[in-house]
Amino acid sequence: MHPLLNTITDPVKLRALDRKLLPQLADELRQFLVESVAKTGGHLSSNLGTVELTIALHYVFNTPYDRLVWDVGHQTYVHKILTGRREGMSKLRMRGGIAGFPRRDESEYDAFGTAHSSTSISAALGMAVASQWEGKKRSVVAVIGDGAMSAGMAFEALNNAGAMDTNLLVILNDNDMSISRPVGALNNYLARLMSGQFYATARRAGEKMLGVVPHVLELAKRAEEHVKGMVTPSTLFEEFGFNYIGPIDGHDLDVLVSTLNNIRNLRGPQFLHVVTRKGAGYKAAEDDPILYHGVTRFNPDAGIIPKASVKPSYTQVFGDWLCDMAALDQRLVGITPAMREGSGMVRFSHEYADRYFDVGIAEQHAVTFAAGLACDGLKPVVAIYSTFLQRAYDQLIHDVAIQNLPVVFAIDRAGLVGADGPTHAGSFDLTYLRCIPNITVMAPSDENECRQMLYTAFQMNTPAAVRYPRGSGSGVAQQKEMQMLPLGRGEIRREGAEIALLAFGSMLQPCLEAAEELNATVANMRFVKPLDDDLVASLAANHELLVTVEENTVMGGAGSAVLESLSARGRTVPVLQLGLPDTFLDQGDPSQMLSECGLDREGIVHAIRARFPK
């Protein structure tokens, strides 16, 4: 089915191909991509959009000696297929299989591990400087999407790279602009001209000659910008010190290969603007690239058929609460850093468009923007993944907590996230949040508790965070009426003897199951900060062993808070802390991962009996 692709086991074989065969290879790769991802799930539309670009990069550059750094990295499936990992696609994002993102420990072709956005230019610049320092004639390429370019870190790197005049190629993979007007014969011709050696040599010679007459040099540069500006979108990147080339058609292999061949011989920082289409070559993904961005298994002939979930996800619980709360309070505004669908804000964005703010991939800005809104009387709710809130930690402390501003953080994907692996796991939020003064930290055990905690957080006039896991809850009915929970108060969910399980958030259900076998007391702690110190003291006074259970690293997490509470009151009861280990956990099925961490019923029982063998 894929006769040409079957012959490509590495980029050396690719570079030996006749250039005329590359379009056929692209067609076969697309067919294989759709067939493969339909069986495993994964990111589809972004990978379909970068087929030709990936082929051209490996065809022109001498990888892995030449470095390719992919921003975010979810668009690297073709890169993995062409670099000897095609067979591994059958276990994509599964335990023991290849990762959905570049990993240095997976292949020498993965020059830099990525998964969060906007890091590629900084990393590539570091590699370029290191190569220059070592006297190596190595090309270094960073491929970054238009969404990732909205983050400040990308512009910080551009600013640094332009000033250093290092040999570096930045490729903007722009899949958000129309391909019809800016990309055409004239534009492609200009791109080849500007990337050619004659143009580059003439440009540098002219700069040297005119450098003795600064005013004339400035006039010449303005004339050049004027000519470029007639057919290119901006001279912004020229102002950063880059030689801007493009935009060009990212699905025209002849143009891509010719342009890249020219660029690899140029000196100094180069910026190539490539326009692509998400989902290219698979009509269903082209028609709805958002639906096909991240997919579960599906029939490629029929396409994705949405199924109604029996149990609402925590993300859906948040989205419904947000709309309900917005109807009750005109001050509520919702903020997301480019995660509208993932954070459950689609309905809110339609029903309350004037109160909805998608700030782009800019977590730091999102948090400080929320702080500014709160300063002047609005009630901002920031919907953000746990792993991405890490990127705005200083803003969380400096701009929100120190000023004690009423910002609500709805923290999705807390705990393990399965197939996306360690880069997306929310393993640390309880640890990094509970040490910040002024903030309240809550962890719901079910859907209704999540709804009530969000309401509680919104009613407070101080910073508050509600962290909840990915996926569905236990199916508990949600109360339409919302009510404040007693601040810093947990509850006893099961009375037992000798052993007390202190469950935080998602760990309540496995604790209740384990308690049946152990005849243990179970407390639903609800609040990590302020901790229910009285409940902890009472449990310590009436039990021989306390067991804290959390879907967060045990290092500095909720269990540590319990130990601190006991120490402050002079209690010496034994405490067993169960949680995520001090390591980065590989991708896999979430239930399997929890089992391996000892956070299911069997694991909890086993750990307690090993510690308390009565």
Swiss-Prot record:
Describe, as the record does, how this protein assembles with itself and its partners.
Homodimer.
Q: Which GO terms describe its molecular function?
A: 1-deoxy-D-xylulose-5-phosphate synthase activity; magnesium ion binding; thiamine pyrophosphate binding
| Source organism of this protein record | Nitrosospira multiformis (strain ATCC 25196 / NCIMB 11849 / C 71)
UniProt remark on cofactor binding: Binds 1 Mg(2+) ion per subunit. Binds 1 thiamine pyrophosphate per subunit.
Q: What is this protein identified as? A: 1-deoxy-D-xylulose-5-phosphate synthase
Enzyme Commission numbers on file? 2.2.1.7
Q: Which UniProt keywords apply?
A: Isoprene biosynthesis, Magnesium, Metal-binding, Thiamine biosynthesis, Thiamine pyrophosphate, Transferase
Q: Which residues bind Mg(2+)?
A: 146, 175
